From Swiss-Prot:
The protein's name: Esterase YpfH
Residues the record marks as active site: 111, 159, 191
Gene this chain is encoded by: ypfH
Similarity section: Belongs to the AB hydrolase superfamily. AB hydrolase 2 family.
EC number: 3.1.-.-
Domain of life from the UniProt record: Bacteria
NCBIfam families for this protein: PRK11460.1
Organism: Escherichia coli (strain K12)
Function: Displays esterase activity toward palmitoyl-CoA and pNP-butyrate.
């Protein structure tokens, strides 16, 4: 499928992980690729791709997944739902191209990109094993969740665009629904990603053990070989 993208890193041998990055409104995949450069050295066997939004935005070089003109709490979910099949198809495309399954796929988004990665797991549970949502939110809070995906919310404490309250509400909803979630608040940070945000993200991918591993251990089971994500 044809879509705007920027390959940050492509390993010489078959990829062991897939990291897909999604930018905010008006940005582009090359710019978001700078974030990918933080992940690439720590995951040398990963295919790292920054994916552009499906449609142009007001900025001549910018892209978006859905328009924010006239957006409200009442119509946001419908706009997300309208483009979601294309978003999921894009993730599936890169999984097929890389030969990497959902168990070793991480979706990383900022702002509108974070909305899309969060909503994609709501629409297609198990699409990826990890989600990192920088300064994002759900269009509407999830009522169900599973531990198949570990969700890491990283949010600026002073975000004037997407209020921190949305991240707190998302964490509470996911916990209530039985999901696997972490929330890190970056003090004094607005609607942006800084070094502290990145350190939270890198540490989670390397060191945070998914909750379902503990659940399987407590039940006397163990993860299958195809259910182990080498992100840690």
């Amino acid at each position: 499928m044809k879509h705007d993208h920027f390959v940050v890193q492509s390993p010489d041998k078959p990829a062991q992980q897939l990291l897909l990055l999604f930018h905010g409104v008006g940005d582009n995949p090359v710019a978001m690729g700078e974030i990918g450069n933080w992940f690439a050295p720590l995951f040398p066997d990963a295919l790292v791709v920054s994916v552009g939004g499906a449609e142009p935005s007001g900025n001549p070089a910018g892209r978006q997944w859905f328009s924010v003109q006239g957006i409200t709490e009442d119509n946001r979910q419908a706009r997300v739902d309208a483009i979601m099949p294309t978003f999921i198809e894009t993730v599936r495309y890169w999984q097929k191209q890389s030969g990497v399954g959902a168990n070793a796929t991480a979706l990383i988004g900022f702002s509108q990109g974070a909305i899309m990665v969060l909503e994609s797991i709501k629409a297609e549970p198990g699409l990826a094993s990890r989600v990192i949502a920088f300064n994002g939110r759900y269009a509407s809070l999830p009522e169900t969740a599973s531990t198949a995906t570990t969700i890491h919310l990283i949010h600026g404490g002073e975000d004037p665009v997407i209020d921190l309250a949305h991240a707190v509400a998302a964490q509470e909803a996911l916990i209530s629904a039985g999901g696997d979630v972490t929330l890190d608040i970056v003090e004094d940070l607005g609607h942006a990603i800084d070094n502290r945000s990145m350190q939270f993200a890198l540490d989670h991918l390397r060191y945070t053990i998914p909750k379902h591993y503990f659940d399987e251990a407590l039940s006397g089971g163990k993860p299958g070989d195809d259910d182990v994500i080498e992100m840690m």
